Amino acid sequence: MLRDELLRSKNDEIARCLLSRKRKLSELYFATVGFAGATENAPTNALYHQKEQTFLDANDLTKGRYFNEATLPPFPDFAALIPRPEEQHSSLEITEPVVQTDDVSSVIAPKAEGAVRGIAPSFQQQEGQTAQVIEQRLVEDSLKKDDARIHQQPALATTSEIPQVANSPTTPAQPDQLPQKASFAVPDTPPTSTSHESVDASVSPALKGLPPSEVAPPRAVSNQLPSAQRKPESRPSLVLAQPSEDQPLSPASSAGPYSNNTPAPVAVSPDTSPAEEVTEGADEVALSPKRVGPVQLQPGLVPSTPDEQLQLEAAQSLQQNALASKSIGDVTTASSLSNEVIKEDVGPTPSAAADSSKETQDQTSTSVEAPEPKRPDGVVVAPEESQPPAQSIQEETQSQVGAEVKVVASTTPAGKKPTAAAVLPAQPERMTTRVSSGAIRHKSVSEILGETPKPSAVQPEKAHAIEKPADMVRAPASASPESAAKMRLKDRKAREKERSKLSTVVFPKQQQQQQQQQEKDDSLDIVRQYAGELARLNEEQDYLFTLFQNKAYAPPRGTNLSTLLASAHKTLTTSNHLLEYQEQMDCRTLRRIYALQNANRWPLRQLKRSVEPPRQGTHWDVLLDHMKWMRTDYREERKWKIAAAKSCADWCAEYVNSDPEHRALLRVPCRIPSKFEKKEAHASSMISPPEETTEEMLVVSQPTPDLIPSAEDESVSDGFNDEIRHDIRDTVAPAAIFSLGSDEFTFSLDMTPAAQKLLDELPIYTPVKIAPGANVPMFEQPPDSAWKTELLPVSKYASGRIKFHETESPRKRSRYDYSQYDSNPEHGMLDLPPEQTNVALFRPENKPIRDRIHPGHSFRPPTEYPMPSVGFFESRQSSQWTYAEDDELRRLVKEYSYNWSLISSCLTPSSQFTSGAERRTPWECFERWVGLEGLPADMSKTQYFRAYHQRIETAQRTVLAQQQAAQQQQQQQQQQQQQGGNNSGQAQPPIRRRTTQPVRVDRRRSSKHLALLDAMRKLAKKRETMLQKQQHASHLASLRKVNDANQPKPPISSPAEFSRLKYDRELKLQERQEQYRQQMIAQQRANLAAQRAGQIPSQQPMMNAPPGRTPNGIPHNPGTPGIPGATPNGMHNGMPNALPNGIPPGMGVSQGRPHMQGVPAGGPPMNGPIPPNPMAMKMMPQTGMPQGPGGRPGMPMQTSPDNTRVMREANRLQEQQRILQSRQQQPQPPQHQQPQAQQAQQQFHNQQQFGPQGSHSPNMNLPNVNGTPNNPAMMAAIQAGSGMQSPSLHNAMPQGVSTPSPRMGQPNLLSGGVVPTISSIQSQIQRSNPNMPPEQVNKLATDRLHQYQQQRMSQVAMNAAAGNMASVQANYQVPHDGNFQSPQPGMNGTPGMQVPQSQGFSPMMRVPQPAQQNRMGVGNSPAMNVALPQQSRSATPQTQRSGSAQAGPVPGSSKSPHPPQAQIPSG
């Protein structure tokens, strides 16, 4: 369907073109063989139609036949068509009383009229050939009759090109009335003639070939022809108004045929050269002799102007096809174009002649598309002469628009008289129209097609040869001093030069064509829609466009816009939400409409209107159309008349207020034609034109040069060749019609191809045209188009479209609306004019001067800012530049002349957040510009730019080195991973080489909004985290406050109470020590007895493993002279890493062995039944066994004062009783610590931890059990690490615990190792008794723990006394926790002596130890295992306990006056 519509439109267009061509051919045929009565709708005979149809068929384009001039019929015999002289005389008598002309005028008139009569048939000819034949015949006839009366005017010459200045003998006597300006009278018109013919004599195309002097008076001959003899197809000739002699020339018409004060009528065609003037009473037409180039030249004559050359060539080419051998017709290059332009200068005249000075009815022929047939000017139709003057005005209005002839009658600025000389084809045709004919967009045709203001005095070379003699005559007057009139004329000349420039007007398509194209497009859009194709989706074509956008940008599974707005991170106002809500409402409505349309339930959905044949136009339609056209035409004509009257009044005022000298410049010379000459002209016009053609041509060729005065002839001939160049330069530009002033209502235009193109593009307002063949009106729009639309407008929504306006209706601004929150601030900006106009700084027209005075375009860097450092160039992120930004940078640099600060501000984005990719600092812009354009050669060598380039290059090298290092490191890591077989699943991407210089990108990824949102999200999360922490801390603080308030504080004990507690504790300690002493004595006795008997206890294999299993271990041979003398390698190999930090590796095992009571230092080795873990047996160190240097082969002697005093005290107190020693050094029993001194133990829990950290057993605080500290540095470390404050060396733990301080209120953790057990017991008690207070729970748990430990200690003591080491070990391994392990043989020495890496034997004494798995291979000395680190279960940091776990002597032992005592648990 779309294809059919396109095909139909093209076919219609072809049909219109063919119809227009056929109509123009009909007009051509009518102009060639017209007959009287045809133009008055008289019934034409069948023969005419038959011949016309034959002619049309011979040139039918549809049959492939192009136009052929040979198909035109020969011209009819005008002698048979011309009426009798009586009729002609009666038709021209109307103006005879006012004719007052000398002989020269009467001589000129017949010849001119002959030309006027002959020129009309060529009005519609494209080539003008046949018109020339008629011109030749008519002119020859008229010239033959008047040959005897011609004295000053030469006859028509076909070969003469010399300008003829018709100077009569009376010319010197009449200085104001030049002979060339011969005026003629228009005879009266009989009652049967129309006002056109009664006033206008038709202009003959023969004037084209006439010399200027003969062309000047064309009226007499035409008026002498009877109306019956004139060609019936003739167009009513136009009337020339009476010229005002004393008015100055208008700048718009100084080079044209008429001045502004002498409005010229519409001459029918540019091909014709009618200089017609209707005289009312005394109407005058002064014909200035104008140079006209004839078709044929004598061998010695050369065309004087380019236009004449063109005319000559065209005429010679046409003469080859002429029907007669001597054709005088002259055709211009624009002859085919000129038939659509009519010159019309209407001057207000009171008589009927003035009324007939309007247009002819054939404006339809002037329209661009379909001009109507036009009547030649040389033929006067009798029936047409009966038309009223008003009708003739109406008819001529159309013809003036379409074909305006430039009548060369304009006067020179020096005061030439307006001439009515015809436009001869020898020069570019000019047209002058009135300003307001209403035919062109409510403008006058003069405004659009008027002639340019070219002063003829300044531009005598304008190829108007008739004007040149007048210029020469007035030359002396122009040499007078400059006056106001001269100055005004000079101004007009300057304006004329401006108009002479080349055209810059773009010719748009005509409105009709645009409307037709728009209608075609609309119809095609409708066709596309009905054909099922998708119409263009935009707001103008589819009201469902909003719904489409909503569907396109809101996918089915996507997030709705309302949801996004609800969770937006930006601040949204009510208007933002309302906009989205309104869009939802619109989409909901459109969706419902769409659904109803698909269901055929939408009431506005209409069926396509049925195709009906268009209604034929009726007479009423034509009448209404003509009424509209006439209304517009009269309205615009009235405007033009007002403008013309104003200008004439201004000229009159200027003339009145001028002095006589200036009045002479403003005066137009003319004279009144005589009545006698008009009558003579009638008689001469009766002779047949062909009879006198040949003789007349001979006459014309010779006397022409004699008619020009020698002085003027010389001046004209001298300037002729030069004028050719000036004519080319001063050609009026067609575009000048658009720059006319308000006081210019006439305009002269050269008929050049450009001018013709301009005229063709101008839309012409014409009434409806009548088809020539069908005789039906041709409406541009169908008569019923006003109501017969595509859709029946049942509602305003049927033909209208829903449009959504972004601009809201004006409303009162709320106090909450501020200008800085306006989303579109650019709408509020006003373009204010500058306050001072005398400042040239910012005025663009002064830029060249400003640049010349202050050269601001010199190259310079942004020196107002310091040059960036090398560090910046190394660490910056590359800025990204798109192609558009590069072009904008170039433009700004050129416009703002290296003002980098201004350039930077123009390129910097408006956002406050600027990413590195959008960095547009002055130096960044400069660097980018240098990268694009490069530095000037002289600038790049300066020190400043060398430093600049050096910084950039240094930064680039640094960045490149960093990238290479990173790549090498990455490659090495990858190689290591591949060699180790540790290939990860995904390889690391290679490091991308980045640059720091500006780079060009096709599209810059705008991630600043994402980065901004990400930063906002992180900040919000950080704030939330901080808030949560604060809330949690405050919650914990509140809970602590509640617990502290509820927990009763312990009462502060008095010194007496502390003394009592101390006494009770010491008593219990003494009792326990006594019990333990007895057990130890029994054990020692049993061991001694066994040694004497040579029996090895059953536990010996466990103690001394076979040497094979314990290489380098301590031998278990009973004959071994003692452990100190044992293999030292055993010490070095067995326990090099397990010794305490303060014990050197060479120390013997014996120094760490606790000596039994009564056993000397050098006694037999302890190969007896010692349990694997000697800490399980509460042995009592014997101070009576000195440990001399001999007993310590690998231990250096300690010489510190503390050690010396300790040793001395030990020797002095050796002899004291063992019971007293044991009582003094007995550690506090656990049952005394908790129930009686709970608070004190809580305050000194850190000191309680020291004892277990120093040793695994209370009776073995140090590796050297005998109390000799080994390393003071180690003691200091132990003291600093544990914070022990005990004044005793060996009773560090009991003494520290037994001296509680009431100043410290720390929780009672007892020892580090006891906490888990107490906690478990407490949890059991709490589960069984949930209502028991915490104090009772703690007390009960401590009691239970003490009972349990007491039972175990008792069992251990009994087993030790019985010598059953295995049972001791078994008892020791009572699994109160899961960390205890049995001895592991085969590791670093005697396996039996290996102590498991778990808690100590006593839960009370368990201390957290650092997580070290170093085990010490101890031979037979159980004391060496004291330094074994233990696995920790307490909360004390292991870094704090590491030193104390491996400590040797207890710090502060030098202050203790008591020797070390055995520590025996009670009970």
Swiss-Prot record:
Component of the NuA4 histone acetyltransferase complex which is involved in transcriptional activation of selected genes principally by acetylation of nucleosomal histone H4 and H2A. The NuA4 complex is also involved in DNA repair. GO terms for molecular function: chromatin binding. GO terms for cellular component: NuA4 histone acetyltransferase complex; nucleus. The lineage of its organism: Eukaryota, Fungi, Dikarya, Ascomycota, Pezizomycotina. Residues 154-314, 329-402, 469-522, 970-1058, 1113-1202, 1216-1307, 1377-1467 are annotated as: Disordered. This is Chromatin modification-related protein eaf1. Keywords: Activator, Chromatin regulator, DNA damage, DNA repair, Nucleus, Transcription, Transcription regulation. The keyword DNA repair applies. Residues 475-484, 970-979, 1175-1186, 1216-1226, 1233-1253 have a biased composition (Low complexity). Component of the NuA4 histone acetyltransferase complex. The gene is eaf1. Signal peptide: none annotated. Residues 877-935 form the Myb-like domain. Residues 1162-1174, 1457-1467 have a biased composition (Pro residues). It comes from the Eukaryota. Gene3D superfamilies: Homeodomain-like. It is found in: Nucleus. Residues 607-686 form the HSA domain. Belongs to the EAF1 family.
